[in-house]
Curated annotation (Swiss-Prot):
The keyword Transferase applies. Its EC number is 2.6.99.2. Homooctamer; tetramer of dimers. It catalyses: 3-amino-2-oxopropyl phosphate + 1-deoxy-D-xylulose 5-phosphate = pyridoxine 5'-phosphate + phosphate + 2 H2O + H(+). One of its GO terms (cellular component) is cytosol. It comes from Nautilia profundicola (strain ATCC BAA-1463 / DSM 18972 / AmH). InterPro entries: Aldolase_TIM (IPR013785), PyrdxlP_synth_PdxJ (IPR004569), Pyridoxine-5'_phos_synth (IPR036130). Keywords: Cytoplasm, Pyridoxine biosynthesis, Transferase. Belongs to the PNP synthase family. This is Pyridoxine 5'-phosphate synthase. 3-amino-2-oxopropyl phosphate binds at residues 6, 17, 213, 234-235. It holds the Pfam family PdxJ. Its main location: cytoplasm.
Length: 259
């Protein structure tokens, strides 16, 4: 099981003060030493965390393969092609969202996605599509020529939070109208859906990754799904690094995934 560590929120901390530290570039050696397999960054259209300057230096200096998340905006795709990361993961974007909400609609944006994939492939860049665990979306992902899909685990993660933490006693409530019995049932159904989606993806010749909202409490059941080859995790690791340091935070996540 590969672990991609998303370092966007190192840039978020830097940008909170609008200065030049912490520098995301400094994380690269730590990721390598801690056993990460990949560095993941998201070059958003609004540049709210990682900037073009960051992306260029990371792609040029990373010891590890770089997975760049991006929208299907042609201008962004051109930037990705110029930077030549190992992989581009196409994701949906809304400027008003706090974080990526839901997967990319491959059916609705098939033409635009095909154009993006063709351009990326012409620049020797692998393509992954960040999608909900929906059978129609998975089937279409194979048809448009992607090598990989990344299953959106956000619903699973939020159900786990609602069932197992105090999140609904905070301002950041999720699934607050569900009782515990319903939450448990929905969590089981979502995990089964992720398993079934993985099976379908593999049958269609796609590599399957997963990510979004995964943390130290909920990662193990997803890591245990046969057929998932990679997890991309960011916020939880960066948040834990405030208390443990980045290297130890990655090591702990790696141990959970491998255990």
């Amino acid at each position: 099981m590969k672990l991609g560590v998303n370092i966007d929120h190192i840039a978020t901390i830097r940008n909170a003060r609008q200065i030049n530290e912490p520098d995301p570039l400094m994380a690269l050696q730590i990721l390598k030493e801690a056993g990460a397999d990949q560095v993941t960054i998201h070059l958003r259209e609004d540049r709210r965390h990682i900037t073009d300057f960051d992306a260029g230096r990371i792609c040029q200096n990373s010891f590890l393969p770089v997975n760049m998340e991006c929208s299907i905006n042609p201008e962004i795709i051109d930037i990705i092609c110029s930077l030549k990361p190992h992989r581009a993961t196409l994701v949906p974007e809304k400027r008003e969202e706090v974080t990526t909400e839901g997967g990319l609609d491959i059916i609705k944006f098939e033409k635009e996605i095909k154009n993006a994939i063709e351009k990326l492939h012409n620049n020797d860049i692998e393509v992954s599509l960040f999608i909900d665990p929906d059978f129609e979306q998975i089937t279409k992902s194979a048809e448009v020529g992607a090598e990989m899909i990344e299953l959106h685990t956000g619903k699973y993660a939020n159900l786990h939070l609602a069932l197992n933490t105090n999140i609904n006693s905070t301002p950041f409530k999720v699934f607050e109208n569900m009782d515990r019995k319903t939450l448990k049932k929905e969590l089981e159904l979502e995990l089964k859906l992720l398993k079934d989606a993985t099976i379908l993806g593999n049958e269609l010749g796609l590599e399957v990754a997963a990510g979004h909202g995964l943390n130290y409490q909920n990662v193990k059941p997803v890591a245990d799904i046969e057929g998932i080859v990679e997890l991309n995790i960011g916020h939880s690791i960066i948040a834990n690094s405030v208390f443990l340091g980045l290297k130890q935070a990655i090591i702990q996540m790696r141990e959970l995934i491998n255990g």
